[in-house]
């Protein structure tokens, strides 16, 4: 079919293909099974379109969440070919192209097209593609994601913000709470205390909000143990799957910067790790491993228990000739130092 409005020519090629949808189905507290559904589709069909057709035409028992169908509500988030995404945003053509790109040469030429769909990770399954998001919402609540005016006088009409102040909130304000970042989070997988990237992205929104009066208490909370920002493993998965480009890791990093600007190295091991790393690299161009562990874990010889915990590792390194007995600065130490000092000056 060809349309020719003016000089522009738009060609629309109608392609029908058969795709096998492999859906991971599961009842609550039972083992998962894979069920396949063949479907005649077009490349432009969204995954949600296909799921609707499967439910309406083949299997009415299939359970999944949906609502807006337009990348607004976040309800239809699920794992599609191994990555968490919105079913209403992803289409058949792009998913098959991504699969072809990552497949081995042996499997690229097969004519059977398959798309695998599974429920979100890091949350228990209720049925099929529907997960229990209670812990997701509880972790969001843990960061108090709302403006606090407890220490301020509430104006008669409203809190006014400049366009510049409001612009700081735009990126995090785009979050639709779809759970894709939470599903992919490596830290959540191994650390049940970690509140998750969605919560910390919202947390930064509160830190950056000029109307909020609770910044110091918030930063104390987000700095605590590994449940807050120091629990992040910086795997970048949250940024890579976010459909709204909220960049949760970037927001977590901003909170860390706020904490590091206010805290001393002696306040906690997490803070000490960052500050000591920078100072050692600035001094020698790279890390002096003889000092790194002692300064961080041993807190500059103030933490006897921490120092004793290093002893077994130190002895094994000595026995195997792996302990660095001396340190030699790198050849580019001066350039590295100048770069770090330039960045520190720009940030101050």
What are these regions (language model features)?
Residues 35-46:
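Short, contiguous acidic and Ser/Thr-rich linear segments
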Residues 17-36:
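Eukaryote-biased recognition of intrinsically disordered, low-complexity regulatory segments
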Residues 2-16:
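Short, Lys/Arg-enriched N-terminal segments with co-localized hydrophobic residues
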Residues 94, 100-111:
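Short, basic, low-complexity termini and linkers enriched in Ser/Thr/Gly/Pro
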Residues 24, 80-83:
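Short strand-turn-strand beta-turns centered on an Asx-Gly dipeptide
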Residues 63, 68-77:
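Short, structured protein-protein interaction patches enriched in aromatics and acidic/basic residues
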Residues 45-60, 101, 113-348:
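Ferredoxin-type iron-sulfur electron-transfer modules in oxidoreductases and energy-metabolism complexes
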